[in-house]
A protein has these predicted regions:
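Chitinase-like catalytic core of GlcNAc-active glycosidases
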Residues: 2-233, 247-249, 253, 258, ...
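C-terminal helical cap(s) of enzyme catalytic domains, especially alpha/beta-barrels
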Residues: 201, 261-283
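Short, surface-exposed beta-strand/loop micro-motifs that present aromatic residues
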Residues: 237-244
């Protein structure tokens, strides 16, 4: 099966090739627009449209520990968010309703700008992500899935790639995990053996939702970071990773994929990985 190439794209303006989605190699399947929560400029809208015409997708992406993060008029202060989304700290039902409203606001933004979906970066505790109240995050995700199904949009979760962070994965209900199109794991400093240990070692991904582990691995994207040059080699190591358990993963990606633009040709590291990950079939 085809393995996807993915990236978190930051510093997006759509003005220069290095800050445009259209500057990416054609074989990049989808990107998460890192820290983009709507309000697209004319240049961004044009760039997005051309990128989609090439067959690629782009989704919104941000961290949201709390209900309302980044979409609350007046800012991210807790009392401001609670007031706007109708949360009464003494009434759990108001959290569930607010989680639905927050999901619908994200859907509205995706529809308004013709963005292809949402990548939920799960690494903060708060009023939305809480092991004491898992129903909040699960209601949020189920609402997104239900609405995205109407328009063919994609839903992605991204979670840090260390075993201690799997507590966030554990909050997600099995049906929610099954409903995800992809899970992007932030496995920034892991080579082959580290990835194997993360997925199938003691306390790894396979220890959670074990009944659906095969399905999860098939849609799991392993990633490295281009933010720190010293860690970039992990990306090239991950391009020929094959899980030792014998189940193939979904693909690979990079945090700040746009940092690989400089080169001749441009995106040299990404292009090499695209070829290595899906080698040409010789008949």
């Amino acid at each position: 099966p085809h393995k996807v190439m993915f990236g978190w794209f930051g510093n997006w303006t759509g003005v220069t090739m290095s800050s445009s989605l259209c500057g990416l190699p054609d074989s990049v399947d989808f990107v998460s627009l890192w820290l983009c929560w709507g309000n697209l400029t004319a240049e961004q809208q044009t760039d997005l449209r051309k990128f989609q015409e090439k067959g690629s997708k782009a989704v919104l992406c941000w961290r949201a520990g709390d209900i309302g993060d980044n979409l609350t008029p007046g800012g991210n202060a807790t009392d401001v968010k609670n007031a706007f989304w109708g949360i009464d700290p003494n009434d759990e039902d108001t959290y569930i309703e607010a989680a639905k409203k927050y999901a619908l606001a994200i859907v509205d933004t995706c529809n308004k700008y013709n963005v292809d979906g949402f990548d939920y970066d799960i690494e903060d505790n708060g009023t939305l992500i809480s092991s004491e109240h898992p129903e909040r995050a699960n209601t949020f995700m189920r609402t997104l899935r239900e609405e995205f199904n109407k328009t063919g949009k994609i839903l992605v979760a991204d979670i840090p790639g260390g075993k201690s962070w799997l507590r966030f994965y554990d909050i997600l209900a099995e049906d929610v995990v099954q409903s995800l199109d992809y899970i992007a794991w932030q496995t920034y400093e892991l080579g082959h053996s580290g990835l194997d240990d993360f997925f199938t070692g003691y306390g790894g991904v396979s220890s959670y939702h074990p009944e659906i582990f095969e399905e999860v691995l098939k849609k799991s994207i392993v990633t490295a970071t281009f933010e720190r040059a010293i860690d970039k080699h992990y990306f090239s190591e991950q391009q020929d990773y094959h899980p030792s358990c014998g189940i193939e993963h979904g693909g690979m990606g990079a945090y700040h994929i746009e940092y690989d633009y400089p080169g001749n040709p441009d995106y040299p590291t990404v292009r090499a990985a695209i070829s290595a990950q899906n080698p040409p079939i010789n008949n």
